[in-house]
Every structure is written in C-alpha cells, then in structure tokens.
Amino acid sequence: MAETVEVLVPGGKATAGPPLGPALGPLGINVKAVVDDINKKTAEFNGMQVPVTVTVDDKKNFTIEVGIPPTTALVMKEAGITKGSTEPGALVAGDLPLEAAVRIARMKFDGMLSYDLKSAVKEVLGTCVSVGVTVEGKKPREMIQAVNNGEYDGVLVA
C-alpha cells in the first residue's frame, strides 16, 4: 500500500532535516533523491513555503506533487515584502499592481471557490486586506468595489 507524506517546505531549499527527513526515513527510500527532486520542482517558489505531497509505493518508488503556495505568500512575493502589516487597515505593508492580483487569481483558480476570474480576483483582493497591502494605491476594499462596478472588466477577461 502506498504511503503519503504531506509537508510544507521552503521553495527550492528543502533539506533532509525536519519535516522531511523524519517523515521519509522510516519508509526506506533515498531521502536525498527526494529532497533534490523537491528542490528542482519548487525552485520557482524560492522564498515561499510550498505544500508538497510525497507518495511512496510498495517498491520504494516515489512521486512528488507540488502544490501552489498560499495566496498570502504569493501576494507578499508580488508586493515585494517579507511580512504583512502588523495593523492591516491602518499600516500599509506594500502595494500590488492589479495585474499581479489577476496573475495570482489565475494561478490559484482551481483551488478557489470562485466560478469566474472576477470573483477569484476579489478573493485575492480580500487577502490583500488581511495582509495590509494596497492595490494600485487604493485600499483593497475600494478596489473590490471598483471591480464590482465593472471599472476593470477589460483587465478581468478570462
């Protein structure tokens, strides 16, 4: 029967230490090979925590599935910040172009509850509220209202 290990690793910088090593060691597979493969697959997410699922079958073969980092991590990377605001709504941690919010929405679309790109972008803008990031210099709630009013329909074409 296949064993599955789900972990959150730093993109491109996974090591054989915790959380991977202790989880994979008892399964009897080459942990270094798994770590090298994970680092190759997560290199584009450098500096972000990435969800990874390692499945090991009875013959000690492994497959690696790389998830998409949390929306918060993607927003912070696109905004060029390492931490969100300590007081979202009062202190601004950074600014995000609307195009970046659309790009994040497209990246995360399959895992979202939204039916269309417009709703997915509003979900990303909601995350911006929590992180304390403005969008195009506006507060995220103002931007959500503008999206609802159709001001950005040209940008939000799927």
Swiss-Prot record:
SUPFAM superfamilies given in the database record: Ribosomal L11/L12e N-terminal domain (SSF54747), Ribosomal protein L11, C-terminal domain (SSF46906)
Record's subunit section: Part of the ribosomal stalk of the 50S ribosomal subunit. Interacts with L10 and the large rRNA to form the base of the stalk. L10 forms an elongated spine to which L12 dimers bind in a sequential fashion forming a multimeric L10(L12)X complex.
GO molecular function: large ribosomal subunit rRNA binding; structural constituent of ribosome
Any one Gene Ontology BP term: translation
Pfam annotation, one family: Ribosomal_L11
PROSITE patterns, sorted: RIBOSOMAL_L11
Entry similarity comment: Belongs to the universal ribosomal protein uL11 family.
Tree of life domain: Archaea
Alphabetical UniProt keywords: Ribonucleoprotein, Ribosomal protein, RNA-binding, rRNA-binding
The keyword Disulfide bond is assigned to this record: no
Lineage: Archaea, Methanobacteriati, Methanobacteriota, Stenosarchaea group, Methanomicrobia
InterPro entries attached to this UniProt entry: Ribosomal_uL11, Ribosomal_uL11_C, Ribosomal_uL11_C_sf, Ribosomal_uL11_CS, Ribosomal_uL11_N, Ribosomal_uL11_N_sf
Protein known as: Large ribosomal subunit protein uL11
Organism: Methanoculleus marisnigri (strain ATCC 35101 / DSM 1498 / JR1)
Gene3D superfamilies, alphabetized: Ribosomal protein L11, C-terminal domain, Ribosomal protein L11/L12, N-terminal domain
Cellular component terms per the entry's GO annotation: large ribosomal subunit
CDD domains assigned to the protein according to its UniProt record, in alphabetical order: Ribosomal_L11
